[in-house]
């Protein structure tokens, strides 16, 4: 199972996790499942009415029903899953594995994305990890994003996650730094020749 995350969804996931940092965020994933059985996440919409705690989050049932009814009338948007965050608390770091309750809340034919948000200890470029996460830093935060689905026996399995934008984001950022350094060096060189 593969999950592709668009640039818009990538930023929405990170911002949702940071907005309520140290508490868990919750939201829905909109997109589609293509003929190759790949989930394409186009949008991530945060639930503003979710009941948040440091170690759990619950969606507002009435608000969820309103949103589902609304989405049912928009044929171009399909709910393909949900997302929530796991954050550190005190000296403990957030982890990316789904809890027992996370697995109970999962539904067949949908994906569940977990965003792990912790304090940044050092800067790290965005990369795919050997254990199937997308990982990197922005500002003061370190993120690990993972996706899960239920197999035919209702067991949670990790999906392969892809976000070309996130990987390219670092490449563009590094390239811009090189260009800025080159431009500054060129200016110094021109001044030395004057």
Indicate where each model-derived feature is located.
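MPN/JAMM (Mov34/JAB) isopeptidase/deubiquitinase module and associated MPN-bearing subunits/adaptors
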Residues: 1-81, 85-194
């Amino acid at each position: 199972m593969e999950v592709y995350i668009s640039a818009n969804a990538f930023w929405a996931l990170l911002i949702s996790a940071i907005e309520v940092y140290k508490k868990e965020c919750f939201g829905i994933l909109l997109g589609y499942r293509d003929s190759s059985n790949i989930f394409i996440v186009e949008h991530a919409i945060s639930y503003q009415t979710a009941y948040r705690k440091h170690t759990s989050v619950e969606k507002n049932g009435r608000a969820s029903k309103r949103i589902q009814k609304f989405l049912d009338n928009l044929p171009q948007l399909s709910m393909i899953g949900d997302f929530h965050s796991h954050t550190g608390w005190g000296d403990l770091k957030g982890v990316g594995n789904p809890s027992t309750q996370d697995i109970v809340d999962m539904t067949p034919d949908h994906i569940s994305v977990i965003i792990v948000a912790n304090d940044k200890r050092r800067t790290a470029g965005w990369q795919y990890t050997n254990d199937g996460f997308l990982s990197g830093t922005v500002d003061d935060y370190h993120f690990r994003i993972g996706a899960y689905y239920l197999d035919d026996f209702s067991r949670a399995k990790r999906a392969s996650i892809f976000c070309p934008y996130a990987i390219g984001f670092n490449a563009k950022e590094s390239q811009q730094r090189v260009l800025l350094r080159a431009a500054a060096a060129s200016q110094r060189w021109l001044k030395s020749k004057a």
